[in-house]
UniProtKB/Swiss-Prot annotation:
Disulfide bonds join 285-314, 438-451. Residues 276-496 form the Fibrinogen C-terminal domain. The keyword Glycoprotein applies. GO terms for biological process: angiogenesis; animal organ regeneration; blood coagulation; cell surface receptor protein tyrosine kinase signaling pathway; cell-substrate adhesion; glomerulus vasculature development; hemopoiesis; heparin proteoglycan biosynthetic process. The lineage of its organism: Eukaryota, Metazoa, Chordata, Craniata, Vertebrata. This is Angiopoietin-1. Residues 1-19 form the signal peptide. It is found in: Secreted. Its main location: secreted. Keywords: Angiogenesis, Coiled coil, Developmental protein, Differentiation, Disulfide bond, Glycoprotein, Secreted, Signal. Glycans are attached at residues 92, 122, 154, 243, 294. One of its GO terms (cellular component) is collagen-containing extracellular matrix. Residues 81-119, 153-261 form a coiled coil. It comes from the Eukaryota.
Amino acid sequence: MTVFLSFAFFAAILTHIGCSNQRRSPENGGRRYNRIQHGQCAYTFILPEHDGNCRESATEQYNTNALQRDAPHVETDFSSQKLQHLEHVMENYTQWLQKLENYIVENMKSEMAQIQQNAVQNHTATMLEIGTSLLSQTAEQTRKLTDVETQVLNQTSRLEIQLLENSLSTYELEKQLLQQTNEILKIQEKNSLLEHKILEMEGKHKEELDTLKEEKENLQGLVTRQTFIIQELEKQLSRATSNNSVLQKQQLELMDTVHNLVSLCTKEVLLKGGKREEEKPFRDCADVYQAGFNKSGIYTIYFNNMPEPKKVFCNMDVNEGGWTVIQHREDGSLDFQRGWKEYKMGFGNPSGEYWLGNEFIFAITSQRQYMLRIELMDWEGNRAYSQYDRFHIGNQKQNYRLYLKGHTGTAGKQSSLILHGADFSTKDADNDNCMCKCALMLTGGWWFDACGPSNLNGMFYTAGQNHGKLNGIKWHYFKGPSYSLRSTTMMIRPLDF
């Protein structure tokens, strides 16, 4: 936009400024235009020419090299007035310029407002078109997104269902795997136990084989020696047969000697019978002790309804003495795997390992009331005992049934003997309460009941081989069910001792 303004006073001041600062050439006569660009607006000012009556400046009128006159120049007052006039004109022009500036600013504000309004209207229409286009595009995109979302939801639902099915299948598989793992662990534990038992059995079998080999070698040596002895005997027999007359003579001499011995024995029996009538017989070791014999050893005692006396070992040292020993184990020199008759009448030597005999035990305990004391020792040297306040057994018809009362001692808080009554069993007389025949399985003769927690007549095992032996000399509540003891002693004493 171009605005043409003409101001006389503005032209005059510009003419004066032009006269003061520059000279125009004669060929530039007429009007002069001054164009000012301000942003988008251009302003053109028409300026009139000056009249050419400008006075020469002081520098042109005076010679700078001339001497100063004594009196002031006549033009000085005129210049002062002219300067004041110019200052007054400048003030007026300044006011006009300020008004012009205000006018331009106000016009520019209204024009700028109009331009902005037009621009806003144009922009609004454009924005509406763009908004409408965007809305349509947004609606289309929204529809597409909705379709995609629906497809994603459907696919997600299918995946979730499949994932759930897979989770259930995985859970079932994990459960089955856990069960199989537990079964495998149980099988492994059983296999470990079986391997351990097999190793133990192999060790035992190896030891038994070594023992059998040693016994075989010993037997072979014994057979060799016996063969040699038999050969020597055969030689002697051949020599004796050849000398029949000498044998007949010796036979006659032996017959005479036998007759003499028979006569002497008859006299000795008659003499002993007379002494028995004179001396009071001992019923048990308590009578021996009370008769003044307080040293442990072998003594002869007599039983009611028994034709012959019996040699027994009397313990005079344990718990004030007077104990009649009915069983003793110490070194395994005697085999306790015997039949009913041998356990009935007894076997062994009272000075070592022996069993007194069930018939004699019944005869003693039928005389008066007795207590029972059992002394035990393990292979580590530990000693213990079990004592019963009442002890007796039945007769043979009752299978020598055991009767006990009142248990005390250090060999376990509970009794390893059956208190309520158990019949005696041997390998040839099964009187226990078990189908397994305890006497055959556990060896020895004992009051087994249903095999029970004790067997002091079992197999004797030496040190190092006494563990894990169910058929050994056992007392369950002292050393457990499979520990074979080193020594045992069963002894009885009258309750009123």
